[in-house]
Amino acid sequence: MTALFTPFTLKDVTLRNRIAVPPMCQYSARDGYVTEWHRPHYVGLARGGAGLVIVEATAVSPEGRITPGCTGLWEDGQIEGMAAIACGIKAAGAVPGIQIGHAGRKASANRPWEGDDHIETGMAGGWETISPSAIAFGAALPKVPREMTRDDIDRVKADFVSAAIRARQAGFEWLELHS
């Protein structure tokens, strides 16, 4: 038997095998809340035999979303839907994981099938982007973000802590930070 199909333990978390489903954005949330799409999608992946299923990039704040369709854990109301996903993944035999992050200068973008470019701040669905420096991501995402202040940095740091706590409350056993 190859190592791929053997259990793997990291600290107090044991995976049934070494197959992990990485976080892949679904862009199907509403205002940061998971929808009817999410639970069957992730539970189905767990039923497929993976040892670890990591839920998509989940924003720590509304302005930290990549698109308006991204999931979030910036408020307590978002825990319930995420808990149903974590519980379903665990019931299917996999370890529930989640990736939390802040999109920075790549935020406020359209979903890939809607153009994958920035949504301007004043347009419907768009918001102000912030980043450590006022430098655009590149030609595909040319919007120049507002340079973060020290207060912004402290707030985003606190947002990561709060989202991690909510992820734990929702039942996730594996946390991945995207920065």
Model-identified regions with their sequence ranges:
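N-terminal amphipathic alpha-helix/helix-capping segment at the start of soluble metabolic enzymes
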Residues: M1-A20, I89
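N-terminal binding-site loop/beta-alpha segment at the start of enzyme catalytic domains
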Residues: L10-K11, N17-E36
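Acidic/aromatic-lined carbohydrate-recognition and catalytic surfaces
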Residues: R18, V55-G115, R150-D151, R155
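Conserved, mostly hydrophobic/aromatic
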Residues: V21, L45, G49, I89, ...
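Short beta-strand segments
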Residues: P22, Q99-G101, E176-H178
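Short, acidic/polar
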Residues: Y33-L45, R155-I165
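Catalytic domains of carbohydrate-active enzymes, especially glycoside hydrolases
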Residues: R39-S61, A170-W174
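Non-globular sequence segments
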Residues: C87, V95, G101-R168
